[in-house]
Curated annotation (Swiss-Prot):
Disulfide bonds join C139-C204, C182-C232, C192-C234. This is Venom nerve growth factor. It comes from the Eukaryota. Residues 47-66 have a biased composition (Basic and acidic residues). One of its GO terms (molecular function) is metalloendopeptidase inhibitor activity. The keyword Metal-binding does not apply. Belongs to the NGF-beta family. Residues 1-18 form the signal peptide. Keywords: Cleavage on pair of basic residues, Disulfide bond, Glycoprotein, Growth factor, Lipid-binding, Metalloenzyme inhibitor, Metalloprotease inhibitor, Protease inhibitor, Secreted, Signal, Toxin. One of its GO terms (cellular component) is dendrite.
Amino acid sequence: MSMLCYTLIIVFLIGIWAAPKSEDNVPLGSPATSDLSDTSCAQTHEGLKTSRNTDQRHPAPKKAEDQELGSAANIIVDPKLFQKRRFQSPRVLFSTQPPPLSRDEQSVEFLDNEDTLNRNIRAKRETHPVHNLGEYSVCDSISVWVANKTEAMDIKGKPVTVMVDVNLNNHVFKQYFFETKCRNPNPVPSGCRGIDSGHWNSYCTTTQTFVRALTMEGNQASWRFIRIDTACVCVISRKTENF
């Protein structure tokens, strides 16, 4: 019986010794190692291709200047900012489309009696020449909606960043400014129209006033007074007499 046990043990040991070695213990240069190397190279190549495709789908981060310019459109504005009437200005309009001008290039302004985002408009007092009535303006002015104002001077004389696009209730509104400026500093050769050039020097100039606009302060939107062109006036001075 003992001889049978010894025989079985010897056969078992011989079988283990004759078994093929595992791939983990295969010497360098064996077929198993070559397959693993090929697999690793293929995986590395696929990884490089994947990384290139990822870089193409996700380009490198933009420069700081580009991120700063585009950050304003991503800032969500609290609707409560528009509920205070003292922040509303008749020359500032928030709209999803360019506001129209009335016919004959008359000046128009934004009506904000009920809602800041209301796009109703009304014609203001005529500031351009009305030749058919025999009435003329001392200075010729032009009024336009300015859509892409990014910088302005605040009430303290410091430059501020103006928000071009405003994200409000998941809708992007553009901030428009109704500006008026002189068409020509000298509508007539002598200066302002209708001024006695024999006794007065005159010229037309654009004046500015302050309006409340939505500006950027860090990463937050805030109301500030900024300067915009609002009128064209005539400046006169008495001519000095030569004695």
